[in-house]
């Protein structure tokens, strides 16, 4: 149990640090729709897709790898709460089209990136 908690904490710390860095660097460039959150969710979706495929193909790996990568790192990197807060702020500002665009981009984009991660692993794995 302690080992599981430790790998989750390490992964979550690294993922949250990367999300913070993306927000600091990218949100200043385009504050209308904070791209740091979008990029964090897209990258996280892609990594989760890759990780799911890789871990499914590697059953001998320790279960802590799943906890480190998916639960920890991707859990710390991706952010539904920040996406929700940013979307509500857009609605409160009366920018409904921006809010709808943000919702579409996050949801469809994250799903597409997860599928792309799965497909990427399948393409690499068949070579």
Swiss-Prot record:
Na(+) is not transported, but it plays an essential structural role and its presence is essential for fluoride channel function. The keyword Oxidoreductase does not apply. Pfam families: CRCB. It is found in: Cell inner membrane. GO terms for cellular component: plasma membrane. GO terms for biological process: cellular detoxification of fluoride. Na(+) binds at residues 75, 78. One of its GO terms (molecular function) is metal ion binding. Its main location: membrane. Keywords: Cell inner membrane, Cell membrane, Ion channel, Ion transport, Membrane, Metal-binding, Plasmid, Sodium, Transmembrane, Transmembrane helix, Transport. Fluoride-specific ion channel. Important for reducing fluoride concentration in the cell, thus reducing its toxicity. This is Fluoride-specific ion channel FluC. It comes from Pseudomonas syringae pv. maculicola. The gene is fluC.
């Amino acid at each position: 149990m302690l080992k599981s908690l430790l790998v989750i904490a390490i992964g979550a710390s690294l993922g949250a640090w990367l999300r913070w860095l993306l927000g600091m660097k990218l949100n200043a460039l385009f504050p209308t729709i904070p791209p740091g959150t979008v990029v964090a969710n897209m990258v996280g979706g892609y990594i989760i897709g890759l990780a799911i495929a890789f871990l499914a193909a590697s059953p001998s790996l320790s279960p802590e790898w799943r906890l480190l990568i998916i639960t920890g790192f991707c859990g710390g990197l991706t952010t539904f709460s920040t996406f929700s807060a940013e979307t509500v702020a857009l609605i409160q500002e009366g920018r409904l089209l921006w809010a709808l665009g943000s919702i579409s981009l996050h949801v469809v984009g994250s799903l597409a990136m997860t599928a792309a991660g799965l497909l990427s692993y399948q393409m690499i794995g068949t070579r």
